Amino acid sequence: MKYAVKVIASAAYPLMFLLACQVVVAQDRTVKDGIFTEAQVNAGEVVYDASCKTCHNMRFYRDTLKSWNNQPLIYLWETIMGTMPADNPGSLLLEEYTDVIAYILSENGFPAGDMKLDPDNGMDVIHILSP
């Protein structure tokens, strides 16, 4: 009986490993996967026009996204949050920074979707792609 349990257990470990790998792979997404909503884009445009547009045009962000290619989106979000606006870094609400990222992504050709972009919910497994 003990032998049968060992055989079953040893056969189950590789299966559990494969299932775990599939879960991890399924969680990885890119900015092409509709990771923000149209409402976030609209809200982000308002914040962008008020706080970002004077210094940064969309060409700036297009080049920025290229330099962040394959990096987790959370890194870009943290960088923008910690350094912008230049005259008062960190002064926007966390949601406003997130909405600005949604607007920047949308303006660079990435699609909106049904999922709301949230730094506390998976932004670390969403990877930036070059526009």
Model regions: which residues?
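Bacterial N-terminal signal peptides
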Residues: S10-A20
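N-terminal secretory signal peptides that target proteins for export/translocation
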Residues: M1-A9
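Sequence context surrounding c-type heme c attachment/ligation sites in exported
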Residues: N42-D49, L65-I74, L94
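Flexible coil segments in periplasmic/lumen-exposed cytochrome c-class electron-transfer proteins
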Residues: L92-P131
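An amphipathic alpha-helix signature
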Residues: L73-M81, Y97-A102
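Short, non-ligating residues that shape and space the ligands of small metal-coordination modules
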Residues: Y61-R62
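Electrostatic cytochrome c docking/interface patches
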Residues: V24-V47
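The canonical Cys-X-X-Cys-His
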Residues: G44, Y48-M58, V100, I104
